[in-house]
Amino acid sequence: MTVLYLRVNLIASLDGTEKKTMTPQTSRAVSQAPSPLLRQTVGSIAVLTLDSPSTRNALSEAMIMALQSALDSIRDDKSVRAVVIAANGPAYSSGHNLKELTARRSDADKGRAYFAHMMKSCSDMMQTIVRLPKPVVAAVQGVATAAGCQMVATCDLAVASDQATFGTPGIDIGLFCSTPMVALTRNVPRKHAMHMLLTGDHIPAQRALELGLVNSVVPAGSEREAAIALADRIAVKSAYTLKVGKEAFYRQAEMSLADAYTYAAQVMTENMMARDAQEGIGAFIEKRDPKWEDR
């Protein structure tokens, strides 16, 4: 099993713009700001770890950019077959960095343009998770609130520590969790989602499991290993079939029943013509393990 650690860095260029790069963790240049995100390769699994415990792994501008950069690089990387998003420290993610946002109220427009930029950047990153042609599993070890809870809901699957908690407490500070609401209402029954949004109450891991926000709850300290094991189980499947299936899953969910069946029938017909479907069906009939070509 190959294990490789990388740190996703944002390097300031001479013209003041930022360039996204992937550099070895051990060779950080003096000009590089410490990255809030680590990337670890475990076999065919890319493990992205939020690594800013001092900010409770807030989804700061740097964190969002690092996640976006990492996900973009993974998209066409054939060596990566699944992704795990984990975190270091006591919190999974506390959501947006409120101090960072508040600091922009001194802008001429009182921060409006920056706030719009941040909300769009975060929303784009969340949609990248959904559209990534590879399964993404959250490994939640602690508190996941606001946009942090949103990211858990956005991931295809989620494994939680029995000490993890989840909430959308924006209502308590006069800021309704509108963008987290999008992911939450698509993964949790509506009245329960509304309860979380209106009260700001945190729910424990077991309740999150009952509501469908997470797939499993494991003893504290084993959530990362469990998430990697789950991702590994999926990674042995045909990458082509996983790509087709994930895209179809999210697209049909937005359609009417009739349109969804029409679309799904078309997808399944095309899938039947794929080399891996021929191989998989043949292997099943011949009682042997399939040899995927990912096409």
Give, region by region, the residue ranges found by the protein language model.
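Conserved CoA-thioester-binding segment of acyl-CoA-metabolizing enzymes
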Residues: V8-N88, Q127
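Terminal peptide-recognition signature
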Residues: L48, S52, L67, I85, ...
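Catalytic-core regions built around general acid/base machinery
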Residues: A70, S121-L132
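Crotonase-fold acyl-CoA enzyme core
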Residues: Q127-L242, A274, E279-G282, R288
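Glycine- (often His-adjacent) and acidic-residue-rich active-site loop
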Residues: A87-M125, A144, S256
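Hydrophobic alpha-helical membrane-association signature
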Residues: M63-A66, M118-S121, E223, A264
